[in-house]
């Protein structure tokens, strides 16, 4: 039986392990993000395929077993791995994706690298994904393609399956037209996205940026515009947009556009919070603090995440307000990049240098101002930190959405706490009750940390309660249901909940 739902995502849905000489799939250790929700749709479809890449040696490639069935799901669900050599992965993911596309998407054009990019390899791998996806798909299947790594897959799928439904979701920011058009491959990328039936983005601003790019490169016509949904802030912040283009015409095709940000999984997070082991960890953290106020700034090592600017602001805080020395602690869990991601080496060195400088200047025998962790924390440990934290300091220079901010709010369950959030994080237009700040302006950063530290408990609860209600209303399940409704998919997944 052919697949009615095909998901294209660069990661496999399960961890692949060897047990007793046999390859088996196990649930991923970290349950956060969109993978659990994608897997639920993958498992519920009548017949489905998940296409991802798998790094193999050149020798393994010759007799590689591409298809794996999932224990407990019978023959209904297939994970199809596209075998790539280490050299292909390096050029496709570590260099072309991260050194050429990533800086442009996040509006850091001075970080853009052209000479080392391998466009031919990128095209080839996208074609391999499309061919793997189409191999046993229904002619009118829904192909759900994820993110910029697979920009070219929609056009290749359309060529192979002209009647298919193709939905693309862009998980990163989509930059302004003058920034995006720096890419020398811009026409091919836009041509492929215009082969979709639906292009989804986190927020209205990214939709409008895409429309501006498409209109600058192709003879497209805007056929429908609407006022933005009440879930989005329409004006007054850096990424606000009052109106949204929801349909384009390109030749004889109509392309639907929409803004529907990825949500988190409140039920899962609350279940983790309720665990005895997590509650014990929260108590231990608070005991170790000894009455100090805890600030958490979680993320990963990346120049777009603003960790350097946040640490510089923290240093200024301790200088400006010496009475806070010994009274507050900053915990910075930022997972370092995988080996081979050379673009992030300087960012990590700078973060480590600044943390060391702050500790060298201000530390006492009884107090360490900054606790920096670059090894990944277990998800339950991170949630425990959020529960214990008085303030979450999430101030990226640019971020497509930022689920960490939402996870902090859910972990606090509408109780006391303060979220400091960059205006340049996509979720800022969903969470106006955060203390919004401009990480490019040191004075605004200083004002925001002062405001957070001074906020009274009643105000904290009011703000956190409103943010929690908004996040619960539009969780990750709603996000996925939204896409399926928009794509008019012939996939039986039960009645989506009402929004």
Swiss-Prot record:
PANTHER family: BCDNA.GH08860, TREHALOSE-6-PHOSPHATE SYNTHASE
Pfam families: Glyco_transf_20
GO BP term, pick one: trehalose biosynthetic process
Subunit structure: Interacts with GGP-P.
Pathway: Glycan metabolism; glucosylglycerol biosynthesis
NCBIfam families with a match to the protein in the record: gluc_glyc_Psyn
CDD domains: GT20_TPS (cd03788)
Gene for this chain: ggpS
Organismal lineage: Bacteria, Bacillati, Cyanobacteriota, Cyanophyceae, Synechococcales
Protein name, entry field: Glucosylglycerol-phosphate synthase
